[in-house]
Swiss-Prot record:
InterPro entries: NAD(P)-bd_dom_sf, Prochl_reduct, SDR_fam
Pathway assignment: Porphyrin-containing compound metabolism; chlorophyll biosynthesis
Role: Phototransformation of protochlorophyllide (Pchlide) to chlorophyllide (Chlide).
Listed GO MF terms: protochlorophyllide reductase activity
Enzyme Commission (EC) number: 1.3.1.33
Keywords for the protein's UniProt record, in alphabetical order: Chlorophyll biosynthesis, Chloroplast, NADP, Oxidoreductase, Photosynthesis, Plastid, Transit peptide
CDD domains: LPOR_like_SDR_c_like
Name recorded for this polypeptide: Protochlorophyllide reductase, chloroplastic
Name of the gene this protein is made from: PORA
Length: 458
């Protein structure tokens, strides 16, 4: 949050130090001048606030160059010169571009910061990322690509899907990720062409971050065709709950609540897409579907009467579990996946006929070596992959799972709405049946209404 010192407002900024005086603030970045009026302070402060995930990317000095600060300027404002040879990017916006925020102009071009030792500077953080990932369409070929947002696209199924779509040459993927630099490195490591992806920061455990992501995506001026809600967290061995920024148990707060808000906000964008393309896909899990063997492994998913969710899921005024019971990390994840499948069904019931958007969920197979299991015990991580490969025969590689999800994104044969897609070794994709717990329309409606209230949509 902004801090006041000597009558000035100093904002912790991801690119430099910005000092707000009583009258205004002026900066000089890359020989471009901009001034914010006092009336713009709340807007600019909001724009420049950076989430904890972005702060972790601070001070990437290995890219070379630094910012210098005029000590004389520090008494009233900050003058910064850029010696960089490359443009940087921040939160999905190219730094050299000018964006309008509530009447104030903000233009930033910088690569790294080395200001902490400068006198008078109270708070500094620097963020850098390759500019080429932020380019707006520069050719007819790029401009005509369809656009797909994938949450959690920096690893696992999300990254594999991004790769599969980019390889067609027909898709531009928006990688919505908590760790900006991890996503950038991941995209490069698998060879996704630089004109086929954009990384935009999104932490689903924070509603502020979700809303900022939507704003930043819209500033790219791309038409959204498909939203894939893929990201998930899983804490099977935790004895005590973790919580999101809004105070929800973290598995449900991230996997369900964050995605629910994101999907609702982006409905406006999806409705503008071409009818043959517009889809919303929410990744399910066999563990949340109790009519399967895996879904019957204790603890089983069970939302009960949603008593915990109705109370806020915060572990203080209510239980941290949706059903109001004692905390169980594995069950919290399974419950969140039931919520995902409920959300898909309710979107279909409420919006498909009116908008033509295809809403679906899927289970692409058991990705036994996914990073989702990184918090599991070592013995499980060692034995689970061979068990799935040689005993259940349900194992699927991340690459193959990514191709399957890419099918659900773009294959005309998988355009049926309200469907939970699954695969098996012999027959390929098929419409799977959901358990009674995961297909209760009254419970789905109640979940929707509670989620609307808790996310501030009503």
């Amino acid at each position: 949050m902004p801090k006041r010192s000597n009558g000035s407002l100093v904002v912790r900024c991801a690119v430099s130090v910005v000092r707000f005086s009583k009258e205004n603030v002026s900066c000089d970045l890359a020989s471009e001048n901009f001034t914010f009026s006092r009336d713009s302070f709340p807007v600019v402060s909001t724009v420049l606030r950076v989430s904890e995930a972005v702060y972790r990317m601070a001070a990437v000095a290995s890219l070379g160059s630094a910012l210098s600060v005029s000590s004389a300027a520090l008494s009233q404002n900050v003058s910064v010169s850029n010696n960089a040879t490359k443009e940087s990017a921040f939160l999905g916006l190219r730094m050299g571009e000018v964006a309008k925020f509530g009447g104030a102009l903000l233009s930033v071009s910088t690569v790294a910061a080395n200001l902490k030792s400068k006198p008078g500077v109270l708070s500094v953080n620097a963020v850098t990322a390759p500019a080429e990932t932020m380019n707006k369409p520069s050719s007819k070929k790029t401009a005509t690509k369809s656009t797909c947002i994938i949450t959690g696209a920096s690893s696992g199924l999300g990254l594999a899907t991004a790769k599969a779509l980019a390889d067609t040459g027909e898709w531009h993927v928006i990688m919505a990720c908590r760790d900006f630099l991890k996503a950038e490195r991941a995209a490069r490591s698998v060879g996704i062409p630089k004109d086929s992806y954009t990384v935009i920061h999104c932490d689903l455990a924070s509603f502020d971050s979700v809303r900022a992501f939507v704003d930043n995506f819209r500033r790219t001026e791309r038409q959204l065709d498909v939203l894939v809600c893929n990201a998930a967290v899983y804490f099977p061995t935790d004895k005590e709950p973790k919580f999101s920024a809004e105070g929800f148990e973290l598995s449900v707060g991230t996997n369900h609540m964050g995605h629910f808000l994101l999907a609702r906000l982006l409905m406006e964008d999806l409705q503008k897409a071409k009818d043959s393309l517009k889809r919303m896909i929410i990744v399910g899990s066999i563990t949340g579907n109790s009519n399967t063997v895996a879904g019957n492994v204790p603890p089983k998913a069970n939302l009960g009467h949603l008593r915990g969710l109705a109370g806020g899921l915060n572990g203080v005024n209510s239980s941290s579990m949706i059903d109001g019971g004692e905390f169980d990390g594995a069950k919290a994840y399974k419950d969140s996946k039931v919520c995902n499948m409920f959300t898909m069904q309710e979107f279909h019931r409420r919006y498909h006929a009116e908008t033509g958007i295809t809403f679906s969920s899927l289970y692409p197979g058991c990705i036994a070596e996914t990073g989702l299991f990184r918090n599991h015990v070592t013995l499980f991580r060692t034995l689970f992959p061979p068990f799935q490969k040689y005993i259940t025969k349900g194992y699927v590689s991340e690459e193959e799972a990514g191709k399957r999800m890419a099918q659900v994104v773009s294959d005309p044969k998988l355009s049926k709405s309200g469907v939970y897609w699954s695969w098996n070794k012999d027959s390929g994709s098929f419409e799977n049946e959901l358990s009674e717990e995961a297909s209760n329309p009254e419970k789905a409606k109640r979940l929707w209404e509670l989620s609307e209230r808790l996310s501030g949509l009503v």
